[in-house]
Amino acid sequence: MNKSDVQENLFSLYLRLNGYFVTGFIVHADQGNKTEIDALAVRFPHHCEPEREIDLSPELDTSGSLVDFLVCEVKGGKKNVNFNVSFREDTEAITSVLRRFGAFTNEEISILVPKIRDVLCPDRIRQSREYPTLDILGTNYRLRFLLVAPDQKRGTNGHKPYIYGDDMISYIWKCFRPEVQRQSCGVRYNWNLWGDQYIKLVKYFKDKNRKAPGDIDSIYAYFDLPALDTAMLNRLEDGDSAPHPI
């Protein structure tokens, strides 16, 4: 498992604990693939798990009346993050992603595509404090685009429309390490039920010897991965041998 896998699984676990169904998505092409979406997610407005005795993460701004569709990009590093050019500027890629949800008509998709290209413009995102959002007329759907910055912290960058590493880590900690025993949701069960994707992360948070949630570097160390190499990431983000345009 590499660092990108850990980042994406951490975010996926965070969404799952907030009531979202989550999957990844490959946008296919005649040769190779056009692009990859780190997470597509949907949450329904009547989701409820009262036995867990925990509120939803406020950073996600969930809705009690809307079906919430998310398109998410997870990016490491300390600089501004954006959706890949191969998604945000490609009409066919955007169309493919919307079709994957299976919730939008062809007419709705044709209306949404140019709006999505507009709201995902990096300059617009940089100047905003809110997640790019489109309401679907005549429905109770909203379509949102979340940028996830696991190597950054809200304390120093809280004005940007991102989900930060400490947002995810602190919330997951509260879910797995409640301060008071819950009547209908025990903490002792077969953790392997979380499956291969999540089990090692779950064990990190449930480790009885761990007294605090730590940070993203603590998680990297647990997975025997090197801490963030800021100098290298800066070079990549400035365009030197970057594997994906941003």
Task: Please identify what each model-predicted range represents.
Residues 1-246:
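Intrinsically disordered, low-complexity Ser/Thr/Pro/Gly-rich regulatory segments
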